[in-house]
């Protein structure tokens, strides 16, 4: 089996905390130097690389003299602010050895949830790649709160892969890859060498939390691969402890787990809607509406809405939830939550009678709706 990375030109590489720190006690400068050297080798092959790197909080803890990861959000944010300085400095110095310029980009969910800011971030990243710069991305932990976090850098890596229409996402971790069961508990567990991204059975194989240094366990990596597949990006989950793992993957060696994007690439606008981690609200729709959305590719009409939850404005992304509580789709609503509460369960012909006006006959037009 040949590595999918060999034929991939635009890569997003995510490196976990344990691979760039000294067991959580500050940054491992030598390890970061090795990552810089490998990425330089990929660049020499004509590949474009965006790096998503953890390590800021661990470096901040070291600089502040803290031995234990704090629980309070303000202390975590302070550690991130201090640590980002060191993280940027080390990466810059190590890449300079290879005559490569780097750029630091700190993102929040709000940056990608707003369409204009999303497009601006995309334009900036593509310009940096065109200029031969290696963007180094992290979540802006200094300003985000729990409610608006990406949650982990695996998810952030997938979102960046979609943002720049990357060919592949490489998630480097301290684990060999995905196993059929927890190898620490099941001696019969075997490595999953290749599977389809988003295959339902993968989530049951994963599970479990990440280390205390980072936030992402294997389940977050599986879900990240599913998300990256929205834009057609394949994913490799591999051990960063393997010597020259990036160079070997680029040479075609199959290492770790390959998750192949087999579904059709979403249109850019629909990718953006699907990638919303938080939505303003949701509507509960009846079984008939679920069937029409899933099988018929229809728009969502007010008559198919059973209930309205949350507060949202016109033009915001909302979720559509079936009677069983599972999300079916999401899309841009033509009506606010207040308006939707007045017109739900009513035929479109009555919208003007109820509201005094009719913006559109649909609550969500099919062109602004994506199945999830």
Curated annotation (Swiss-Prot):
Its main location: cytoplasm. GO terms for molecular function: ATP binding; glutamate 5-kinase activity; RNA binding. It is found in: Cytoplasm. Keywords: Amino-acid biosynthesis, ATP-binding, Cytoplasm, Kinase, Nucleotide-binding, Proline biosynthesis, Transferase. The keyword Cell membrane does not apply. GO terms for cellular component: cytosol. The keyword ATP-binding applies. ATP binds at residues 14, 173-174. It holds the Pfam family AA_kinase. It comes from the Bacteria. One of its GO terms (biological process) is L-proline biosynthetic process. It is an enzyme of class 2 (transferase). Substrate binds at residues 54, 141, 153. SUPFAM superfamilies: Carbamate kinase-like (SSF53633), PUA domain-like (SSF88697). Its EC number is 2.7.2.11. InterPro entries: AceGlu_kinase-like_sf (IPR036393), Asp/Glu/Uridylate_kinase (IPR001048), G5K_ProB (IPR041739), Glu/AcGlu_kinase (IPR001057), Glu_5kinase (IPR011529), Glu_5kinase/COase_Synthase (IPR005715), Glutamate_5-kinase_CS (IPR019797), PUA (IPR002478). Pathway: Amino-acid biosynthesis; L-proline biosynthesis; L-glutamate 5-semialdehyde from L-glutamate: step 1/2. Residues 280-358 form the PUA domain. It catalyses: L-glutamate + ATP = L-glutamyl 5-phosphate + ADP. Catalyzes the transfer of a phosphate group to glutamate to form L-glutamate 5-phosphate. Belongs to the glutamate 5-kinase family. This is Glutamate 5-kinase. The lineage of its organism: Bacteria, Pseudomonadati, Pseudomonadota, Betaproteobacteria, Burkholderiales.
